[in-house]
Regions:
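Short, low-complexity N-terminal intrinsically disordered segments enriched in polar/charged residues
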Residues: 1-40
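A solvent-exposed, acidic/Ser-Thr-rich amphipathic alpha-helical stretch
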Residues: 13, 31-82
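Acidic surface patches and DE-rich sequence motifs
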Residues: 46, 92, 105
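Short, surface-exposed coil-to-beta transition loops
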Residues: 72-74, 94-99
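Residue-level signal for tight coil/turn positions that link beta-strands
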Residues: 82-85, 107
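Short beta-strand segments that buttress and anchor functional surface loops
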Residues: 86-93
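Short beta-strand edge/turn micro-motifs at domain boundaries
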Residues: 97-121
Length: 121
């Protein structure tokens, strides 16, 4: 699950950190940094289906960031934590809501295992 990708990026010490890190890295055009927020076999929902695993998630973010969009932080909700799993959610400024499942890694950091970036909006 966890690998050396996080050594060159800040690691999430709380599940809520992942949303902030996403906005920072997306606005910086840091595709590798975005991919580092996910477990190696994570699932990312897309308008056309889903991306599974590091390579497909990387391709999805390369496509998304090609036009250099700007991301605005939303209202991060407190994580709902049960053991090594956490449900995270953010209400975006356009009214859309994101929902993610994060998993605590063996070193205590958190990575997304499932990401549904837009369920309303």
């Amino acid at each position: 699950m966890h690998d050396d990708r996080l050594r060159r990026h800040e690691a999430a010490t709380a599940p809520e950190d992942l949303g902030r890190m996403f906005v920072e890295r997306a606005n910086a055009g840091d595709v590798a940094g975005l991919v580092a927020l996910y477990e190696a076999d994570a699932v990312l929902a897309l308008p056309t289906g889903q991306a599974t695993g590091t390579q497909q998630i990387r391709q999805a973010y390369e496509h998304l960031l090609a036009d250099k969009p700007t991301f605005t932080p939303g209202e991060q909700q407190p994580a709902l934590v049960n053991g090594d799993l956490a449900l995270t959610s953010t209400r975006l400024t356009d009214g859309a809501v994101t929902v993610e499942v994060a998993r605590r890694q063996p070193d205590g950091t958190w990575l997304w295992a499932v990401d549904q970036p837009n369920i309303l909006g």
